[in-house]
């Protein structure tokens, strides 16, 4: 009897151990899974991250990491700006309006923009579809950067030349014009048209009015030395359809599920003919189509000040993923070779393909920060040396001509360097100073500190030369007067 009881006890104990192991396994797996998303957030240096997977029926899984700029935990209701994924909404809306007979996709742009008659764009024969495909010949941005819709139209009118029609060249300006064209043709605002046509089809109602987005979406972040700085770029209504729709990760995943269903069924917007961009890429209705060893991914990414985004799906597996995170700056883009971020690599692996490129190991944005830090320290040491030699050194005997040359060289080099540091980034990148502060606050702060140091150094050199000249004259006068 004792032996039987012992065996029963051992069997019971074994059952408990097995049950505990079984129950613990999912928790361990869940912990490992959470570590994966935390690592992605760390690699992105993102304060907040949302990853939502989907299939043709909707959301299948979701993970959230970190906080927004108000220190609220990222979750299902957290709002992000979706960036250039917005272009696929605008393209789909244009195609729906074309079905309703409100827009002719094959019409020349001059039908909807008579002010372009006789301009470089008006003369090249670009159509509405060319705006969708980025084949209208327009540049990516205008330089200087426009402040409102009229400045965009005026900037396009003033372009001395444009590329030939048919050559794909990604252009944000094309989609600003496409949104305005839609509004002109339909006689209603972009937001109202989305709510009337696209939202009922997709089941998704993104934030599409500038005042609502500006007041409800928490600020994003830009890299700032070893951390991040909360930044906000005020959005205007004319640029919503180009890259500023906003919403949650779930909403974007539901939209992705609609796009997946439409593609699988061969329905709008997948029916728009595609244009080749490179050997492995095509572009359709606001989406890229890329081949990975026989597997095609359909996707678009987005990057606006403070926010990064990705939405894509694999038609063959029926799986899709959305990645949203609340940091983006010019330094990020330099660090990641433009668009090859850890998020892109993560998304492609999630969709079952081997990424063609990995994130860059050489972070050029960080290199610039370190270089400018070294220059700031060097300039400060030089200022200290100039002051020290001025106070402790006997004024050297130099000719007036040599002093004039020294002063002139200091002024030319100093003023030139200051102007280059203050206005060079604006001229080079075509951004305004406020926009550069939003997208690259640490780099711009360093430029201004370095410019101030050079201005002080230039002033010290000039004043020191004048003081030494005065000392030399006084010494000469005393020598002349002495018996």
Model-derived segments and spans:
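Extracytoplasmic/secreted proteins, especially bacterial periplasmic and envelope-associated proteins
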Residues: 32, 36-39, 84, 89, ...
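Short active-site loop at a secondary-structure junction
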Residues: 44-47, 71-130, 161-173, 384, ...
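C-terminal segment of classical bacterial N-terminal signal peptides
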Residues: 19-28
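Catalytic loop of the DD-peptidase/beta-lactamase superfamily, centered on the K-T-G motif
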Residues: 31-55, 234-483
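Short, conserved catalytic-motif segment at the N-terminal edge
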Residues: 31-82, 102, 118-119, 153
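Bacterial N-terminal signal peptides that target proteins for export
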Residues: 2-14
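Short, surface-exposed loop or secondary-structure junction motifs
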Residues: 65-67, 120-308
């Amino acid at each position: 009897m004792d032996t039987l009881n012992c065996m029963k006890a051992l069997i019971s104990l074994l059952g408990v151990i097995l049950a505990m192991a079984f129950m613990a396994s999912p928790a361990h797996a869940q912990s490992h899974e959470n570590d994966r998303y935390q690592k992605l957030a760390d690699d992105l240096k993102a304060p907040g991250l949302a990853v939502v997977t989907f299939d043709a029926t909707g959301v299948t899984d979701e993970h959230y990491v970190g906080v927004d700029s108000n220190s609220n935990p990222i979750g299902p209701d957290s709002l992000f700006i979706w960036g250039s994924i917005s272009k696929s909404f605008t393209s789909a809306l244009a195609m729906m309006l074309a079905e309703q007979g409100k827009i002719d996709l094959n019409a020349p742009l001059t039908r909807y923009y008579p002010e372009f008659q006789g301009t470089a764009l008006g003369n090249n024969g670009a159509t509405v579809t060319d705006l969708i495909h980025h084949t209208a010949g327009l540049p990516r941005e205008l330089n200087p950067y426009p402040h409102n819709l009229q400045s965009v139209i005026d900037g396009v009118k003033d372009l001395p030349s444009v590329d030939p029609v048919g050559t794909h060249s990604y252009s944000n300006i094309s989609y600003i014009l496409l949104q305005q064209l839609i509004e002109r043709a339909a006689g209603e605002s972009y937001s109202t048209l989305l709510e009337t046509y696209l939202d009922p089809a997709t089941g998704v109602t993104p934030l599409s009015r500038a005042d609502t987005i500006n007041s409800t979406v928490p600020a994003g972040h830009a890299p700032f030395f070893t951390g991040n700085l909360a930044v906000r770029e005020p959005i205007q209504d004319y640029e919503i359809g180009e890259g500023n729709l906003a919403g949650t990760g779930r909403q974007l995943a539901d939209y992705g599920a609609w796009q997946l269903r439409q593609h699988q069924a061969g329905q709008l917007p997948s029916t728009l003919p595609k244009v080749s961009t490179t050997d492995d890429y095509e572009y359709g209705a606001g989406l890229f189509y890329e081949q990975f060893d026989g597997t095609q991914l359909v996707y678009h990414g987005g990057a606006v000040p403070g926010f990064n985004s990705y939405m894509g799906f694999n038609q063959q597996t029926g799986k899709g993923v959305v990645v949203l995170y609340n940091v983006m700056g010019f330094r990020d883009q330099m660090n990641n070779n433009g668009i090859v971020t850890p998020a892109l690599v993560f998304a492609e692996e999630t969709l079952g393909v081997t990424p063609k490129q990995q994130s860059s190991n050489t972070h050029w944005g960080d290199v610039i920060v370190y270089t400018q830090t070294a220059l700031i320290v060097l300039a400060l040491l030089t200022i200290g040396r100039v002051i020290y030699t001025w106070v402790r050194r006997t004024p050297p005997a130099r000719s007036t001509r040599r002093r004039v040359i020294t002063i002139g060289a200091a002024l030319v080099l100093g003023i030139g360097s200051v102007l280059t540091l203050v206005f060079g980034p604006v001229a080079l990148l075509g951004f305004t100073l406020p926009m550069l502060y939003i997208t690259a606050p640490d780099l711009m702060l360093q430029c201004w500190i370095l410019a101030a140091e050079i201005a002080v150094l230039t002033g010290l050199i000039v004043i020191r030369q004048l003081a030494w000249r005065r000392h030399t004259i006084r010494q000469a006068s005393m020598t002349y007067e002495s018996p």
